[in-house]
UniProtKB/Swiss-Prot annotation:
Record carries keyword DNA damage: yes
Residues reported in the UniProt entry to bind NAD(+): 29-33, 78-79, 107, 130, 164, 278, 302
The protein's name in its UniProt record: DNA ligase
Pfam families assigned: BRCT, DNA_ligase_aden, DNA_ligase_OB, DNA_ligase_ZBD, HHH_2, HHH_5
UniProt keyword list: DNA damage, DNA repair, DNA replication, Ligase, Magnesium, Manganese, Metal-binding, NAD, Zinc
Species in which this protein is naturally found: Streptococcus pneumoniae serotype 2 (strain D39 / NCTC 7466)
Binding sites annotated in the UniProt record for Zn(2+): 395, 398, 413, 418
GO molecular-function terms, A-Z: DNA binding; DNA ligase (NAD+) activity; metal ion binding
PROSITE patterns given in the database record: BRCT, DNA_LIGASE_N1, DNA_LIGASE_N2
Catalytic activity: NAD(+) + (deoxyribonucleotide)n-3'-hydroxyl + 5'-phospho-(deoxyribonucleotide)m = (deoxyribonucleotide)n+m + AMP + beta-nicotinamide D-nucleotide
Biological classification of the source: Bacteria, Bacillati, Bacillota, Bacilli, Lactobacillales
Gene Ontology annotations of biological process type: DNA repair; DNA replication
Length: 652
């Protein structure tokens, strides 16, 4: 029976690839169904012989307990946005300072959810959400139910690929019709529907909703030398790659493509929100490098946002964790980009003055970056009042005088004991990208603060399980889970804590770079600003901000209290060892290694202080080669770069 099951699995997987990937089926639906039923019968009779890549895994129901955290071996960066031709020209100018004659590749920006797929020996072992770029959620079982994701590859590869998982418009209409018939709330748009589907604990629901994917990148070190060749290779492996793309030599060609896509946008069977422009040559990408948050070799052009008219009813002023006071407009409700909008940001007092926004004005509302509702401008022809908005002079939280510094556009409260700032700081500290304390959201933090149970972040770690039972609406089970989540967060790697402290200009990426270099927050506390500023991708602004924070009264006490409560202050990831054998060197791995897995070789190089990259360029210091090294070895020899073999690496 095992032989026949092998035959059926191979046949059905081939037919599925023809149908979903190539759009060129070689058998009828009825023949596919007949073979599928035969396989189901055999697997029912011989469950111990079910194969890992059987297509029946895609439809079976499985109720999951939840989603585990998963550390990305290759971090996912954000893309810099562009909203105009001028911003694209500026991007091109920056690229041409480093690369003489760049060729660009333009791809559609799918409005879906970023995913990372890892295969070992050609078998799908992990499907993960983007998360914060470093840590995502393991949703492998759900992604196995997405029919166009290969469970196995035609080669026994160790490879990680990236793409977008989305819901086609036709599937979205079907899902919403079913929800309407069942009396369930409809999804606002296909992206929300895809996100909700991938968060399902019942995998049978995922299988029914017909999600789809477009893959766009090999995240693990590639043997291809361009993005275009990489996309073609992904197609050869059986992944679905969006065919709508071009190579361009200049911004004129890119702009023409953007205009063409914009005209076709509404007729596509899926949602897009822009065009991604990348430098095509991977060695040039390597040469350009990254900022703290984004690659310098790519930009995402975003289409102009949908705009609607609404009437301004009133303005709320709220204080953020850094003391900035932000105005928010209350509006007559309007439908915008698939959701009902009744509140929109007014940004700051300078923006209100610049746009001359007045009481009861009719305003144009849009979603900035297709996400945040914002007031764009006033419809002056519909103005009914000349009365200006009331601008506060005192903090709406603590009543302290508000300041408007000359070099800032916002009002600011500088009272360090301002309740709103403290509470917002606590919410930030517990958030997913910071200490990731599950369940400790804004409502619980507000109740803890109101009950005088927490005044700073160290107090969170002094809480006992019974303290939560003092809060309205919190039962024993919830209290136990909250306490356990707080205890678990003590073990986080220290970059999560550093970001959680809310130091101005120190984001999650900068926190990771700092801890990779200094190894612990205590070492960072002792460091001078010149050493911080010398770290690649950081600079003087972050160094000055850290110096100001650590010099402030109470910072040393807070760190000591956190340590005393058991919070980890050390970095648990791969550190940069200043005096290691390969410290500061840029190394490329290429070819087939005989004894080490590629991931093992990469980890060893990084432990020796090297930065491992995927392409050979003039910035490369060393190339480690295995069998069939190919074009990367040739390029290294042409550039006079030092070449070593696997035996040399093992000897270190």
């Amino acid at each position: 029976m095992n032989k026949r099951m092998n035959e059926l699995v191979a046949l059905l997987n081939r037919y599925a690839t023809e149908y979903y990937t190539s759009d060129n089926p070689s058998v009828s639906d009825s023949e596919y169904d007949r073979l599928y039923r035969e396989l189901v019968e055999l697997e029912t009779a011989y469950p111990e012989q079910v194969l890992a890549d059987s297509p029946t895994h895609r439809v079976g129901g499985k109720v999951l307990d939840g989603f585990e955290k998963y550390s990305h071996q290759y971090p996912l960066y954000s893309l810099q946005d562009a909203f105009s031709r001028e911003e694209l020209d500026a991007f091109d100018a920056r690229v041409r300072k480093e690369v003489a004659h760049p060729t660009y590749i333009c791809e559609l920006k799918i409005d879906g959810l970023s995913i990372s797929l890892t295969y070992e020996k050609g078998i799908l072992v992990a499907g993960v959400t983007r998360g914060d770029g470093s840590i995502g959620e393991n949703i492998t079982e759900n992604l196995k139910r997405v029919k166009d994701i290969p469970l196995t590859l035609p080669e026994e590869l160790d490879i990680t690929v990236r793409g977008e998982c989305y819901m086609p418009r036709a599937s979205f209409d079907q899902v919403n019709q079913a929800r309407q018939e069942n009396g369930e709330p409809e999804f606002a748009n296909p992206r929300n529907a895809a996100a909700g589907t991938l968060r399902q604990l019942d995998t049978a629901v995922v299988a029914k909703r017909n999600l789809a994917t477009f893959l766009y990148q090999e995240a693990s070190p590639s043997t291809r030398d361009s993005q275009e060749k990489g996309l073609k290779y992904l197609e050869q492996l059986g992944f679905v790659v969006n065919p709508k793309r071009i190579l361009a030599e200049n911004i004129d060609e890119i702009w023409n493509f953007i205009q063409e896509v914009g005209q076709e946008r509404e007729n596509l069977p899926y949602d897009i929100d822009g065009v991604v422009i990348k430098v095509n040559d991977l060695a040039s990408q390597e040469e350009l490098g990254f900022t703290v948050k984004a690659p310098k070799w790519a930009v995402a052009y975003k289409f102009p946002a949908e705009e609607k008219e609404a009437q301004l009813l009133s303005v709320d002023w709220t204080v953020g964790r850094t003391g900035v006071v932000t105005p928010t407009a209350n509006l007559t409700p309007v439908q915008l980009a698939g959701t009902t909008v009744s509140r929109a940001t007014l940004h700051n007092v300078d923006y209100i003055a610049e746009k001359d926004i007045r009481k009861d004005d009719t305003v144009i509302v849009y979603k900035a970056g297709d996400i945040i509702p914002a007031v764009l401008r006033v419809v002056e022809s519909k103005r009914v009042s000349e009365e200006k908005l009331d601008i506060p002079t005192n903090c709406p939280s603590c009543n302290s005088d508000l300041l408007h510094f000359e070099d800032e556009v916002a009002l600011r409260c500088i009272n360090p004991r301002c309740p709103a700032q403290i509470m917002e700081g606590l919410i930030h500290f517990a958030s997913r990208d910071a200490m990731n304390i599950t369940g400790l959201g804004p409502s619980i933090v507000e109740k803890l603060f109101a009950a005088n149970l927490v005044k700073d972040v160290a107090d969170i770690y002094r809480l006992q399980e019974e303290d939560f039972l003092l809060l309205e609406g919190v039962k024993e089970k919830s209290a136990a889970k909250l306490y356990q989540a707080i205890q678990a967060s003590k073990e986080n790697s220290a970059e999560k804590l550093l970001f959680g402290l809310g130091i101005r200009h120190v984001g999650s990426k900068a926190s990771q770079l700092l801890l990779q270099y200094f190894h612990s927050i205590e070492n960072l506390y002792q460091a001078d600003s010149e050493e911080v500023a010398s770290i690649e991708s950081l600079g003087g602004v972050i160094a000055k901000s850290l110096q100001t924070y650590f010099a402030a009264e109470g910072s040393e006490i807070l760190l000591r209290e956190l340590k005393e409560t058991g919070v980890n202050l050390d970095y648990k990831g791969q550190t940069v060892v200043a005096d290691a054998a390969l410290s500061g060197l840029t190394v490329v791995l290429t070819g087939k290694l005989e004894r080490l897995k590629r991931s093992e070789a990469k980890s060893k190089l990084e432990s020796l202080g090297a930065k491992v990259t995927g392409s050979v360029s003039k910035k490369t210091d060393l190339v480690v080669v295995g069998a069939d090294a190919g074009s990367k070895l040739q390029k290294a020899q042409e550039l006079g770069i030092q070449v070593r073999d696997e035996a040399w690496l093992e000897s270190l």
